[in-house]
Amino acid sequence: MAAKRTPTLDRIDVKILAALQRDGRSTIQKLADKVGLSPRACLERVRRLEASGIIAGYQALVELAKLSQPVNVFAEIVLEKQASQGRFEQRLAAIAEVVECWEVSGTIDYIARFVCADLATYEALTSKLIDDPNLGVARIVSHVALRPVRRFTGYPEALLARKLV
């Protein structure tokens, strides 16, 4: 089986990625003007970036606080044994309130971000995780977020440019 090749990018590809991170609704014409290409050439590059999986999709950033008073909780999760890791990850992926989860190194196994309607909902979800013996959750340490200081809005352009041709 052939090794999967990492797509190579040039400076124009990086400009396209940076521009789309800032404004994913930009028209091809506006994008082409920003990066100095014809609309057709720009569209071909965008399609290539999409086909390669570098552009994985497009989303709207929803300001949830304008709709409700959600509770953001960051949970440090430790498993009793790594054998239950697959079951645990599947269960977490099925919980709509888990909007992000990372496996990490160190004294904990995962950091998960829960966005819930209230603390009672969060408590019920984590109790189910802890009480399920098939998941092997040893403990969950919760950190309730008070306010966002900085939110993710895209990767730094310098990181996008790491694999230039």
Regions found by a protein language model. Give the residues of each.
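A compositional/biophysical signature of low hydrophobicity enriched in polar/charged and small residues
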Residues: 1-165
